Amino acid sequence: MSKNVVVIGTQWGDEGKGKIVDWLTDHARAVVRFQGGHNAGHTLWVNGKKTVVRLVPSGILRPDVECFIGNGVVLSPEALLKEIDELEAAGVNASARLKIAEGCPLILPYHIALDQAREAAKGDAKIGTTGRGIGPCYEDKVARRALKVIDLFDPARFETKLKENVDYYNFLLTNLFKAEPVSYEAILADTMKMAERIKPMVADVSRTLYDLDKAGTPILFEGAQGTLLDIDHGTYPYVTSSNCVAGAAAPGAGVPPQMLNYVLGIVKGYATRVGSGPFPTEQENEIGAFLAKRGNEFGSVTGRPRRCGWFDAAALKRSIQINGVSGLCVMKLDVMDGLEEIKLCTGYMLDGQKVDILPFGSDAVTKCEPVYETLPGWTGTTVGVKRWEDLPANAQAYLKRIEEVCGAPVDIVSTGPDREETIVLRHPFGL
């Protein structure tokens, strides 16, 4: 039996999961997306060349790696084919190596229309969604009206279900939001055309992964977004529409939980958040501006600037607890080079009481006042460092303090965007 690894974000997303998934596929022979949609991009740098993937797993740049989209992913046919075309134009043989689960719900134009109409109607109270139809598609799944990938193989059933859904969504769009209706005929024609390209990629992903595991093939499960955006465990309602935690890999890919052997928690050396919602350690000052500029903190899909702040160890403790994190990978350590001092949030004052872990819900998190430790920064560079002993002493001390406060080992340190700019203390695949 193989040793399989789940990679998850432990903050509010944007931790740098794409680079590490790409790096880990030097050993993994299969990579699986198990939740989310094309609302988050994973940025890969190989030999100085940038590639952003949104739906296709980050292992696609390795020609000997099989890639899978599990049933927990909501799939936009248009976004998928656009991404495949971009990859293949760059010389990556994507479609031949990608398998899509039959149970993936389809994101269609009415989901996008409703998503955007809702956000516009909320004004200043908006959640900050990407407007790509992710939430409404998950709503359809729970309401048992979703059109799924398997429906593409039965045109008559697809037409019937599509007509019902278009009527339902147009009622909402025109009556509740005074928005333009969507065209049933256009959606049907466009989707059926795209279906001819998608159907050859459809497979029994659950059974295929089970067989690969039995054959001893190392599998990597690639999470999207981050634990603090999880629909159940995040700062609700300022969350995404899916479960972003390690446990979601089992239902989202159709595998038993016993197949998940090691959980790698990805965390930046500082904290960022996109969109609305509480952020206790946010720095709306020169420190935040420094981190944003040095870290190039802009969304890879949306282009939205990210809010920046100090490392929140109390929030990380919550993520470690929920995910059962085996080891941490600290990203973007090099961004902090040159800071005279670094603050580390070890807990909060909440209603006059000291708490050492992130509380539940956005109301409580909004009231949290961070309690900081101040550590000395470092003047030496960490850029491109590949050995622990070559890190500045204060950088080593910072990472060790994170381990002590959070209770999980730092197994990997990233010192730059490229694959090779990585320090490995313990390999997730046991190498």
From Swiss-Prot:
One Pfam family, short name: Adenylsucc_synt
Q: Where does Mg(2+) bind?
A: D14, G41
Pathway stated in the Swiss-Prot or TrEMBL entry: Purine metabolism; AMP biosynthesis via de novo pathway; AMP from IMP: step 1/2
UniProt KW keywords: Cytoplasm, GTP-binding, Ligase, Magnesium, Metal-binding, Nucleotide-binding, Purine biosynthesis
SMART domains for the chain? Adenylsucc_synt (SM00788)
Q: Name one GO cellular component term.
A: cytoplasm
Q: Which GO terms describe its molecular function?
A: adenylosuccinate synthase activity; GTP binding; magnesium ion binding
InterPro entries documented for this protein = Adenylosuccin_syn_GTP-bd, Adenylosuccin_syn_Lys_AS, Adenylosuccinate_synth_dom1, Adenylosuccinate_synth_dom2, Adenylosuccinate_synth_dom3, Adenylosuccinate_synthetase, P-loop_NTPase
What's the EC number here? 6.3.4.4
One GO biological process term is: 'de novo' AMP biosynthetic process
What is catalyzed by this enzyme? IMP + L-aspartate + GTP = N(6)-(1,2-dicarboxyethyl)-AMP + GDP + phosphate + 2 H(+)
The residues that hold substrate are S300, V301, T302, G303, R304, P305, R306
Give the active-site positions. Answer: D14, H42
Binding-site positions, IMP: D14, E15, G16, K17, N39, A40, G41, H42, T130, R144, Q225, T240, R304
Query: Which cofactor(s) does the record list?
Result: Mg(2+)
What's the record's note on cofactor binding? Answer: Binds 1 Mg(2+) ion per subunit.
What enzyme class is recorded for this protein?
Answer: ligase
- Primary localisation category: cytoplasm
The cellular location(s) given in this protein's UniProt record come to: Cytoplasm
Q: Which family does it belong to?
A: Belongs to the adenylosuccinate synthetase family.
The record's listing under NCBIfam families reads:
PRK01117.1 (NF002223), purA (TIGR00184)
Assembly notes: Homodimer.
User: Which HAMAP family does this UniProt record tie to the protein?
Assistant: Adenylosucc_synth (MF_00011)
**The protein's role, per its UniProt record:** Plays an important role in the de novo pathway of purine nucleotide biosynthesis. Catalyzes the first committed step in the biosynthesis of AMP from IMP.
UniProt protein name: Adenylosuccinate synthetase 2
Q: Which organism is it from?
A: Chromobacterium violaceum (strain ATCC 12472 / DSM 30191 / JCM 1249 / CCUG 213 / NBRC 12614 / NCIMB 9131 / NCTC 9757 / MK)
List the taxonomic lineage.
Bacteria, Pseudomonadati, Pseudomonadota, Betaproteobacteria, Neisseriales
Query: What gene codes for this chain?
Result: purA2
